[in-house]
């Protein structure tokens, strides 16, 4: 809860030889202690003043929303509870290094007998901070350097410059973030970026230069994000041996799209949950706000987690998506879905399922993938209560398919095609949770349902990332 200081509303009895009162002369029986406890916990109080000490460049109006509930407290316990909640809100703004709370009796000419003053002692972050860290993506590691200007305009705004150098991707960007006063979950962000990625499974190199604007807000138990993005995309071949199908995709394109994402997440952890569920739905519409790329793209993700006996966890997941080109132009290799690898359908090489040409995987316009997982403690529980709890034994069954659809046919024909040539795999391994950052998997995989052109990874397969099927 941090540091909370409180002083009793009534003066405590004093003792000592200089006062002529000895401890033996005082009645310290149980009934009086119970009465004192009742006074502290249940006596009605009024919060008269709330002070914030230590402000420099922060505007006070942005903080008024975060501490307003403290004035509604009715007793001392309620004051402490609401003060702690206000402290958490202040820290969530990301503009203070630390926040301490002091609760004291009210002072001044207008002080009431049951009045309280609450003081938040804050220390602001420096005007500029730097950071260096490593990140783990979908089977990719990267080094990240960042410069941040927190509270740049005094109302919890944040200006960030970030450079990332990874094994397959290099990027840098500038972003501006501003929350709505009193509602941190409602915020606006503006981003400028350049990303260069290499995709060896497709012999493709892509460079994106873009700008995006996002608005995030909650509705009931759901989180929503509305986004506009304009991207200048440059596609090129990664090697001279690239297939003709990939060479045809080379060149420049301009994508302007509107996107919406909805998330319901009740999981206790995003990396290795033990309970809870996740529902994520994404829609993207390109072409109606400009550019030469037009499509409608839909995809979803569902995950359910249930704790079983002997500290084991059963997890099920389902992914799916569809891409519909609008107009006469075919879909781009940069917009299609990809499937396979240690983070999706295990036992297959990275994104090496589905349509391909001369060994280059071209992606598909429709896909689905599902998995059933059983996570158990390590045999004999070595390191229980400590480092050993970061490891779990992992048993899995994965399945999925990726293909292109003929949109002149009906839904029944589409479902029939998605049900054909299903790839699936099963196996077992060990999972290591790296805090709330990422997780590592080392599995022994047995791929089944392999189709012509698929690239498999029969045996031991290593995976690292955040999002796993």
Curated annotation (Swiss-Prot):
Family the UniProt entry places it in: Belongs to the SAM50/omp85 family.
GO BP terms, alphabetized: cristae formation; liver development; mitochondrial respiratory chain complex assembly; protein insertion into mitochondrial outer membrane
Species, as recorded: Danio rerio
Pfam family, one: Omp85
Primary site of residence: mitochondrion
InterPro entries on file: Bac_surfAg_D15, D15-like, POTRA
PANTHER family: SORTING AND ASSEMBLY MACHINERY COMPONENT 50 HOMOLOG (PTHR12815:SF18), SORTING AND ASSEMBLY MACHINERY SAMM50 PROTEIN FAMILY MEMBER (PTHR12815)
Name of the protein: Sorting and assembly machinery component 50 homolog A
Recorded topology in the membrane: Multi-pass membrane protein
């Amino acid at each position: 809860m941090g540091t909370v200081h409180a002083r009793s509303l009534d003066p405590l009895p004093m003792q000592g030889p200089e006062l002529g009162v000895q401890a033996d002369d005082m009645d310290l029986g149980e009934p009086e202690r119970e009465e004192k406890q009742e006074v502290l916990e249940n006596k009605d109080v009024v919060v008269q003043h709330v002070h914030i000490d230590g402000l420099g460049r922060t505007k006070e109006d942005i903080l008024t929303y975060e501490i307003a509930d403290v004035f509604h407290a009715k007793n001392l316990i309620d004051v402490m509870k609401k003060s702690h909640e206000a402290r958490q809100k202040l820290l969530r703004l990301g503009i203070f290094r630390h926040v301490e709370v002091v609760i004291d009796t009210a002072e001044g000419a207008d002080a009431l007998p049951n009045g309280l003053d609450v003081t938040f002692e804050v220390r602001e972050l420096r005007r500029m901070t730097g950071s260096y860290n490593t990140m783990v993506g979908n089977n990719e590691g990267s080094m990240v350097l960042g410069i941040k200007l927190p509270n740049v305009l005094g109302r919890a705004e944040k200006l960030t410059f970030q450079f990332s150098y990874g094994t397959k991707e290099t990027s840098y960007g500038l972003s501006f973030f501003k929350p709505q006063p009193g509602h941190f979950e409602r915020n606006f962000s503006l981003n400028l970026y350049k990303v260069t990625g290499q995709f060896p499974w497709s012999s493709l190199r892509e460079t994106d230069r873009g700008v995006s604007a996002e608005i995030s807000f909650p509705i009931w138990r759901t989180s929503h994000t509305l986004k506009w993005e304009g991207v200048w995309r440059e596609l090129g071949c990664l090697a001279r041996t690239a297939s003709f199908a990939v060479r045809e995709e080379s060149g420049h394109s301009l994508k302007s799209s509107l996107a919406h994402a909805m998330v319901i997440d009740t999981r206790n952890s995003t990396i290795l949950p033990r309970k809870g569920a996740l529902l994520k739905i994404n829609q993207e519409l390109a072409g109606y706000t400009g550019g030469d790329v037009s499509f409608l793209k839909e995809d979803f993700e569902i995950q359910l987690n249930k704790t079983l006996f002997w500290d084991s966890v059963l997890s099920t997941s389902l992914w799916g998506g569809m891409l519909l080109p609008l107009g006469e132009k075919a879909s781009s290799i940069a917009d299609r879905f990809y499937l396979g690898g240690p983070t999706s359908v295990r036992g297959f090489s990275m994104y090496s399922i589905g349509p391909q040409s001369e060994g280059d995987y071209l992606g598909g316009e429709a896909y689905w993938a599902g998995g059933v997982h059983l996570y158990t403690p390590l045999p004999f529980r070595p390191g229980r209560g400590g480092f050993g709890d970061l490891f779990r034994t992992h048993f899995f069954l994965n399945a999925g398919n990726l293909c292109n659809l003929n949109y002149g046919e009906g839904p029944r024909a589409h479902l029939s095609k998605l049900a054909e040539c299903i790839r699936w795999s099963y196996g077992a391994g060990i999972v290591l949770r790296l805090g709330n950052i990422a997780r590592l998997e080392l599995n022994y995989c047995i791929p089944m349902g392999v189709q012509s052109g698929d690239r498999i990874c029969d045996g031991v397969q290593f995976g690292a990332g955040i999002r796993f099927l």
